[in-house]
């Protein structure tokens, strides 16, 4: 390629020595000589006045040196601009997120993205896990963030963090004053929960069924805030992410029941369709998602 040949000619003129030019370019001296020979053949003129001890540029060599500097600069500028075009983060990124993630976990990351990439327009749609999966499957979102699992086999799923779940209770509940409880103490309790299709509801159903717990009643509300308000007002217990309860715990509006030798954890994941193009915007988002939360993911 003429770019390499011109760079060789520039190095020879500036170093005034074939050997030094070869060292600078990290190529062999015969390659340097061949490049100069090919240039002289191309332009049908002598570019260098050679002597046993030194050389000088001919008038045509001076012309080529000036133009070669310009051409190399323009080539490298074009290369940098093309790279920037493909790697510059701008445009739109459509994110679908479940309620817990979208309302309590995602906002700090979005603020970080906005600060680093001010020309990136973020379009965040919040719904339950089932709705998020459907949006990604229908290519209405570049990426989805869900709690639990998805039944959409055509989507790719990757965990990005581990979420601590808590059993929330009204402060006046009989179990709230105990340091620890056993899982059997939760038998025949009233529960407040999210709607079907929610990852939080799926997790509660799993906890109840896997431990043989029969609820006295189930009260369904389709928002985390609604569930919390119901618990605060004494309507029952609930299982919610600690991130959802953080402010309520600080203000001591809700109690957490600690179960002896029992851990409540789930994985949060991102999903995307293999049919959707992997854009730079999505790659940047996934990289930041992992760097912010991957340390909280226990393998």
From Swiss-Prot:
<dbReference type="Pfam" id="PF03466">
    <property type="entry name" value="LysR_substrate"/>
</dbReference>
<keyword id="KW-0238">DNA-binding</keyword>
<keyword id="KW-0678">Repressor</keyword>
<dbReference type="GO" id="GO:0003700">
    <property type="term" value="F:DNA-binding transcription factor activity"/>
</dbReference>
<comment type="function">
    <text>Transcriptional activator of the cysJI operon which is involved in sulfur assimilation. Also negatively regulates its own transcription.</text>
</comment>
<feature type="DNA-binding region" description="H-T-H motif">
    <location>
        <begin position="18"/>
        <end position="37"/>
    </location>
</feature>
<dbReference type="InterPro" id="IPR036390">
    <property type="entry name" value="WH_DNA-bd_sf"/>
</dbReference>
<dbReference type="Pfam" id="PF00126">
    <property type="entry name" value="HTH_1"/>
</dbReference>
<keyword id="KW-0804">Transcription</keyword>
<dbReference type="GO" id="GO:0006355">
    <property type="term" value="P:regulation of DNA-templated transcription"/>
</dbReference>
<dbReference type="InterPro" id="IPR005119">
    <property type="entry name" value="LysR_subst-bd"/>
</dbReference>
<protein>
    <recommendedName>
        <fullName>HTH-type transcriptional regulator CysL</fullName>
    </recommendedName>
</protein>
<dbReference type="InterPro" id="IPR036388">
    <property type="entry name" value="WH-like_DNA-bd_sf"/>
</dbReference>
<keyword id="KW-0010">Activator</keyword>
<dbReference type="GO" id="GO:0000976">
    <property type="term" value="F:transcription cis-regulatory region binding"/>
</dbReference>
<dbReference type="InterPro" id="IPR000847">
    <property type="entry name" value="Tscrpt_reg_HTH_LysR"/>
</dbReference>
<comment type="similarity">
    <text>Belongs to the LysR transcriptional regulatory family.</text>
</comment>
<feature type="domain" description="HTH lysR-type">
    <location>
        <begin position="1"/>
        <end position="58"/>
    </location>
</feature>
<keyword id="KW-0805">Transcription regulation</keyword>
